[in-house]
């Protein structure tokens, strides 16, 4: 349940909401005007898939995970896109679009207007992520015979969380939470290695 954000009035830079009856208002009243959003924290659709191929000594394996229909409240934007928080927190580059004069079309109210905990913070956190990528190359046996000691040799690369496609503007759409507030994201990881068998 949240109050529905209706944008910023281009005439005076004040935020607007829809009240419980669907009328525009500039008075935020969470108790009276909160409505069921129909959005859910848990994705009704989720899954994963993988693919692999090999050619001669080269092999590539990739694993993906996805979720669809998941929503999260991006509370980072409450602090990073809020003119009243500018002296306490770093601000997002979007703050360059803050309302400054009549006629400005923006979703960021003028300085002095408090951002509220409404639907403009609720975001689609559906995503597709490459979870793992493994690329390895095994050297030909005839090359190893020439070494007179090494039976097998291969080099490999492992990458984790290399790619994420999402509309979510926060750092990471994957955590199993309904509200993000400067949470550490899943990190990208890179591993290079060599395996020798004597």
Report each predicted region and the residues it spans.
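C-terminal beta-signal and terminal closure region of outer-membrane beta-barrel proteins
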Residues: 1-12, 103, 115, 164-198
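Surface-exposed loop/turn segments flanking beta-strands in extracellular/periplasmic regions
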Residues: 23-28, 81-95, 173-183
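Strand-connecting loop/turn motifs
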Residues: 55-58, 150-152, 187-189
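Flexible loop/turn segments at secondary-structure boundaries
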Residues: 61, 68-72, 163-166
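Membrane-embedded beta-strand positions of outer-membrane beta-barrel proteins
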Residues: 62, 155-157, 194
């Amino acid at each position: 349940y949240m109050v529905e954000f209706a944008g910023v009035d281009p005439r005076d830079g004040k935020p607007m909401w829809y009240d419980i009856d669907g009328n525009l208002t500039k008075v935020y009243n969470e108790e009276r005007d909160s409505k069921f959003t129909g959005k859910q924290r848990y994705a009704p659709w989720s899954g994963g898939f993988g693919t692999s191929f090999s050619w001669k000594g080269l092999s590539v394996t990739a694993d993906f995970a996805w979720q669809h229909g998941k929503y999260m409240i991006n509370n980072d934007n409450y602090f990073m896109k809020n003119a009243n928080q500018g002296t306490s927190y770093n601000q997002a580059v979007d703050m360059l679009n803050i309302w400054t004069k009549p006629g400005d079309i923006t979703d960021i109210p003028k300085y002095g207007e408090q951002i509220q905990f409404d639907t403009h913070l609720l975001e689609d956190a559906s995503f597709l992520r490459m979870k793992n990528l493994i690329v390895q190359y095994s050297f030909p046996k005839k090359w190893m015979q020439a070494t007179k000691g090494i039976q097998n040799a291969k080099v490999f690369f492992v990458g984790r969380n290399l790619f994420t496609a999402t509309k979510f503007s926060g750092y990471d759409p994957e955590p199993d939470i309904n509200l993000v507030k400067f949470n550490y994201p899943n990190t990208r990881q890179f591993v290079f290695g060599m395996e020798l068998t004597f």
